Swiss-Prot record:
Organism, as annotated: Prosthecochloris aestuarii (strain DSM 271 / SK 413)
Binding sites annotated in the UniProt record for ATP: 30-37, 147-150, 176, 184-187
Protein name: Pantothenate synthetase
Keyword vocabulary terms for this entry: ATP-binding, Cytoplasm, Ligase, Nucleotide-binding, Pantothenate biosynthesis
Record localization: Cytoplasm
Assigned GO CC terms: cytosol
Coiled coil spans: none
Assembly information from the UniProt record: Homodimer.
InterPro entries hit by this protein: Cyt_trans-like (IPR004821), Pantoate_ligase (IPR003721), Pantoate_ligase_C (IPR042176), Rossmann-like_a/b/a_fold (IPR014729)
Residues that, per the record, bind beta-alanine: 61
Role noted for this protein: Catalyzes the condensation of pantoate with beta-alanine in an ATP-dependent reaction via a pantoyl-adenylate intermediate.
Length: 288
């Protein structure tokens, strides 16, 4: 595995790989690697002969009073995990390389980025989209693998690549959970043992919605209210949002249509740790 820190060097390597007709897949991360990231790498390796892993804690996607400065950066551990996963290239630039003096261009997203995460974290997705586009241009990948856990981010990136005719295929990797149902996340390390127990309520709320949908409930407001009531039973839980959206477009829906796919998406504070989660549902067809 080669570790590259210079964007121009990474571009040159990727260009040479393309000239040799090598299929390239990229997995973009902020580091603090875990089993979820390893599953993305595994999927990338199944799809392409060369895998580039990027590690970059992107300052442009963090808002004021968020955890940019304390976000975990265990680079030695990350590089060891990447090597063990048989990554070909680890691209790990610093911020001065990605946003040099005078940098002033960025992506401005549309409605899909304005709701939910976008409402609670203004400009977050503009920062995400800008760095994702830069990494696509630097790594020159044919395929980019993203996790289902950040479902709205995935929808924003798909919208961007479609709108801007970016020649790259977006692959979605399934969300991974620990045995207690908590979605695997780098931020889980912030949770105390008691908070970790309470964090399992996110999965219970998503599972309750699944049960109710399979029973025939199609009123989004009722499903959301039931999820909120369950979450509010935990003493350290504070809700940013709970919503139901169409699975691909991320448009919010009041009534779920039979045969269509939707997601319940939620962002919950457990103590001082903000967790996001989601689950996809297919609404049963009505029997004749």
């Amino acid at each position: 595995m080669q570790i590259i820190t210079n964007p121009r060097e990474m571009q040159n390597i990727a260009e040479n790989l393309r000239m040799k007709h090598q299929l390239i897949a990229v997995v973009m991360t902020m580091g603090a690697l875990h089993e979820g990231h390893l599953s993305l790498i595994k999927l990338a390796k199944q799809q392409a002969g060369t895998v580039i892993l990027t590690i970059f804690v992107n300052p442009a996607q963090f808002g004021e009073n968020e955890d940019f400065h304390c976000y975990p950066r265990p680079f030695e551990k990350d590089s060891s995990m990447a090597r063990a996963a048989e990554v070909d290239y680890l691209f790990a630039p610093d911020a001065s390389m990605m946003y040099p003096e005078g940098f002033q261009t960025g992506i401005h997203n549309g409605p899909v980025a304005a709701i939910l995460e976008g409402e609670h974290r203004p400009d977050h997705f503009n920062g995400v989209s800008t760095v994702v586009l830069k990494l696509m241009m630097i790594c020159k990948a044919h395929i980019a693998v993203f996790g289902e856990k950040d479902a709205q981010q995935l929808a924003v990136i798909k919208r961007m690549t479609n709108d801007l005719n970016i020649d790259i295929r977006i692959l979605e990797a399934p969300l991974l959970r620990d045995d207690d149902g908590v979605a695997i996340s780098s931020r889980n390390i912030y949770l105390s043992s008691e908070e970790r127990k309470q964090a399992a309520v996110l999965f219970r709320a998503l599972s309750l919605a699944d049960k109710r949908i399979q029973e025939g409930c199609t009123a989004a407001e009722k499903l959301i209210d039931e999820a909120i009531s369950l979450i509010e039973q935990e003493p350290d839980a504070k809700i940013d949002y709970v919503s139901i959206v169409e699975a691909e477009s991320f448009t919010q829906s009041a009534l779920l249509e039979p045969g269509k796919e939707y997601r319940m998406v939620l962002a919950i504070w457990i103590g001082t740790t903000r967790l996001i989660d989601n689950r996809k549902y297919r609404v049963p067809l009505i029997s004749a």
